[in-house]
């Protein structure tokens, strides 16, 4: 779910905090990518026709493999250095949200049956997408694929967004890429949206700078966390009647959730019971993550050609010629990515360059500040096209 209404709130109140960037501006940069979010996007869009998805001969869905394979090659071709971070065990406080998602999928499944009976194709596609769930098998398939591609994989002990933010704060990566805005709530210094969007949509990457977000909103980090909780997050329901703008006004006026609650008009606003905002705050400020010093050095290695062919062609029915051509593209892309950014030739380490609060001049000049909420929209799709296709419609 992320943080309700946060994208528009930032666009309306902290214009300088968001810049439009070209995909290629991140050449040589290490980017932590929320793997589960990417897989979800691929399952929603890749190879989909109504309620049908790409499958192998055993009837197992392969859309996630095709999407991950093709998009990762595209990322590497642009010279980026992706690090995919996978979710671990969710916090207990998230169980209520997960239960709600399960119920929504169940409702969507019933609506899907009705849509199929009435022959309404638009509703069939709509409700089919709402039934999508990223499974353990989907995650395992993609972990295996990425390792065969020679791309680093991180397994978070809990929330992937928190692990990504920790890597970013520790300067292990330059930025975090996801579509969930709670990456900012966890403290990511740089946050990217639309990085995994298909090239065909021609959407710029949106780069959020947390320091400028705080400056624009007039809050410190503790107050920003409280704002996100008040807006509505995975750990706490919203308070009916309090939208993002009202939440910002209240936090600016009172400074903390405790004082907001003390001064809240109880006749007008009903606080959910329970409303565990203190535990939610703790999870955002002190999440369960791998200590940065224990994270191994990231390495991008040569792809395992035979392993990829076995997984994609033999096990999942991908076209052999397309896969082999894609692997050649992957090898070329790996060589390009290994060149690194220009500063590396002058002895500047990646961690040193990350300490700058703003992007290099070449990137800043290419970036374009986002000034309207309309320019900041959530991603809706993953790539439909790529160098390798496999499977058949389910």
Swiss-Prot record:
Record's compositionally biased regions (Basic residues): 382-394
Keywords, comma-separated and alphabetical: DNA damage, DNA repair, DNA replication, Endonuclease, Exonuclease, Hydrolase, Magnesium, Metal-binding, Mitochondrion, Nuclease, Nucleus, Phosphoprotein
Coiled-coil stretches noted in the UniProt entry, renumbered to this chain: none
Region of interest: N-domain: 1-105
Cofactor entry: Mg(2+)
InterPro entries for the chain: 5-3_exonuclease, 5-3_exonuclease_C_sf, Flap_endonuc, HhH2, PIN-like_dom_sf, XPG-I_dom, XPG/Rad2, XPG_CS
Gene Ontology process terms (BP): base-excision repair; DNA replication, removal of RNA primer
E.C. number(s) listed in UniProt: 3.1.-.-
Protein name: Flap endonuclease 1-A
Organism (species): Physcomitrium patens
Gene: FEN1-A
């Amino acid at each position: 779910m992320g943080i309700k209404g946060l994208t528009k709130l930032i666009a309306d109140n902290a214009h300088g905090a968001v810049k439009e960037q070209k995909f290629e501006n991140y050449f040589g940069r290490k980017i932590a990518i929320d793997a589960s979010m990417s897989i979800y996007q691929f399952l929603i869009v890749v190879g989909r026709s109504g309620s049908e998805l790409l499958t192998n001969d055993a009837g197992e869905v392969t859309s996630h493999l095709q999407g991950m394979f093709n998009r990762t090659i595209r990322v590497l071709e642009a010279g980026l250095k992706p690090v995919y971070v996978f979710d671990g065990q969710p916090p207990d406080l998230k169980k209520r949200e997960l239960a709600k998602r399960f119920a929504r999928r169940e409702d969507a499944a019933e609506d899907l049956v009705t849509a199929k009976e009435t022959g309404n194709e638009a509703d069939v596609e709509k409700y089919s997408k709402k039934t999508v769930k990223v499974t353990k098998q989907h995650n395992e398939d993609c972990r295996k694929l990425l390792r065969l591609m020679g791309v680093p994989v991180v397994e978070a002990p809990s929330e992937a967004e928190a692990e990504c933010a920790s890597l970013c704060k520790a300067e292990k990566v330059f930025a975090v890429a996801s579509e969930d805005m709670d990456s900012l709530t966890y403290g990511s210094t740089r946050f990217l949206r639309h990085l995994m969007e298909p090239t065909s949509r021609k959407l710029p990457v949106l780069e959020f700078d947390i320091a400028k977000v705080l400056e624009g909103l007039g809050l410190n980090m503790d107050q920003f966390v409280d704002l996100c909780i008040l807006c509505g997050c995975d750990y706490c329901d919203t308070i009916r009647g309090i939208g993002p703008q009202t939440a910002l006004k209240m936090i600016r006026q009172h400074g903390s959730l405790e004082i907001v609650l003390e001064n809240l008009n109880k006749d007008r606003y009903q606080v959910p019971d329970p409303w565990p905002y203190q535990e939610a705050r703790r999870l955002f400020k002190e999440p369960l993550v791998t200590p940065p010093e224990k994270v191994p050095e990231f390495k991008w290695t040569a792809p395992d050609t035979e392993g990829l062919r076995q997984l994609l062609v033999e096990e999942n029915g991908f076209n052999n010629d397309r896969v082999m051509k894609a692997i050649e593209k992957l090898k070329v892309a790996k060589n390009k990515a290994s060149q690194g950014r220009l500063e590396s030739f002058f002895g500047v380490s990646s961690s040193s360059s990350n300490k700058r609060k703003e992007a290099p001049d070449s990137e800043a000049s290419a970036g374009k500040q986002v000034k309207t909420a309309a320019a900041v929209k959530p991603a809706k799709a993953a790539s439909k096209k790529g160098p390798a296709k496999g499977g058949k419609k389910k």
